Amino acid sequence: MIGDMQKWTPNVASIIEHAKNLYPKQEVISRMISGEIHRTNYEEVCIRSRKLASVLEKDGYKKGDILATLALNTYRHLELYYGISGMGAITHTLNFRLHPEQAVYIINHAEDKIIFVEVPFVPMMEALKDQLSCVEKYIILCDKNELPETSLKNAISYEEYIEEGDENYVWPELEDDAACGLCYTSGTTGNPKGVLYAHKSNILHAYAALTGLTISPDESILMVVPLFHVQAWGIPYYGPMFGLKLVMPGMQMEGEPLYDLIEREDVTLAFGVPTVWMGLLSYCRDNNKILKSVKNTVIGGSALSLAILQEFDEVHDVNVIQGWGMTEMSPLGTSNLMTPEMQKMNKEDRYAMQLKQGRPMFGVELKVVDDSGNELPNDGESQGHLMVRGPWILQRYFKADKDAVDQDGWFDTGDISVIDEDGYMTIKDRAKDVIKSGGEWISSIDLENAAVGHPEVAEACVVGIPHPKWDERPILFIVTNSGEPIEKQSILDFLASKVAKWWLPDEIIFLKDLPHGATGKLQKFELRDEYNNYYMEK
């Protein structure tokens, strides 16, 4: 027997229609390339998304076609999210920080038919266009009078392209599991892998995020996380779904312009990766500024450090919510919300709790297994491979020959983790980054977080390097606040009270910059490759 409820055909365009009907005048704010602040609202975004969809359909693009965006966080990119996917095509968000070879591979692998290009990235596409046989048209995200001279095929400005579109376009009904968006993984040594999201999975993910992050309807959200990065953590969907004010910084992600935008738009909730917040906090510190309106910040992408948590809390009275997920998870899997129990703790214990990745949102299941696949207890001590499953988690990679999950539907995240008796998950390390020294394990993440607590350390990276006696030993790479080396012994003395003696790095190397990937994550494999023989040659 089945239930007697009405059939529902999911289409993410229903979200922007909902926003138009219930929150038509809610603002969508963008800082444009010129620095100008552009203001629109959900009603206008919806109407322009319809116009885009109708023109794409008129041009012969159909359900299942893959259309790419190479764009910044602005209102036009938000329109692309709905206009492309709403008419049944697939929105493929390209990362403009990709190495050219990776960009060529991804575009050709996806078989993108159109690329919507921001003006600053036109030269990048001109350099690659002869290697992209699949692309039929380039639509430049600008007004007609701003269209640059270009050799790109069939180039046209976005505003001219949608000018004759039908603002009364009716969104089509789609198949139950119709594809919606495409994003490729980053930070791997091989070719990136595509993750194909569905309309249904994105809508379910948005519902879960609203509850899992306890977002209130009067929030003004600063969306620093890029729209190209795992669907901006779902904000383009649950923002309009809940009628939230969206504030997008465009290209200017440095501390001063971010602070200016936060103050100007009374931002209450901000989303971003740790490296962005390091820049904002540094600007505030150097200029005696306080984040007056911000109540909460959601941090993900890489592990939250105690130094960032402490400064947000003690200096700015901002609550930090750590979130965890990955491209294969749409991306949100866990969140670490402030609970009444945590509020009663002393500061040291509360910080220790907040540094955990958190508990799974409804719909996500977690477990930790040993090397043989046996489930380990949730005791906060048993480390193992973190496995996940749920309705917005990958089944198989795009165009892959086989599933990426085991026979019971569990996906191996590649993380080494523990889960405690209350369900809080803590990532100890990536399986490929954990350091095995003398038969014991050293967490590179824990060592990095300890190092950035030093007042003169801006950023730290730890990698395990082959050692003739101990199998592997850590090297600590440091970027200082001044950019100049400091006394290594001061670092070791500081760490000695934070970690076990045998965890202390055998070598500390000062660098001007650490290698980051296209989404801001540390590229440890670059340092591992460069210094692989360091201990063997000594």
Regions found by a protein language model. Give the residues of each.
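Structural core segment of the AMP-binding/adenylate-forming
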Residues: 15-17, 58-59, 86-160, 482-484
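Conserved pre-ATP/AMP-binding loop-to-beta segment of ANL
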Residues: 24-27, 139, 162-184, 191, ...
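Conserved AMP-binding/adenylate-forming core of the ANL superfamily
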Residues: 28-74, 78-82, 99-104, 157-160
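Conserved AMP-binding A3 loop
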Residues: 39-43, 180-204
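AMP-binding/adenylate-forming catalytic core of the ANL superfamily
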Residues: 98, 104, 115-117, 390, ...
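Conserved AMP-binding/adenylation subdomain of ANL enzymes
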Residues: 203-220, 228-268, 283-284, 334
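Gly/Ser/Thr-rich phosphate-binding loop
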Residues: 267-272, 281-351, 365, 372-377
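Conserved beta-loop-beta connector loops within the AMP-binding
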Residues: 360-387, 421-422, 484-488, 523
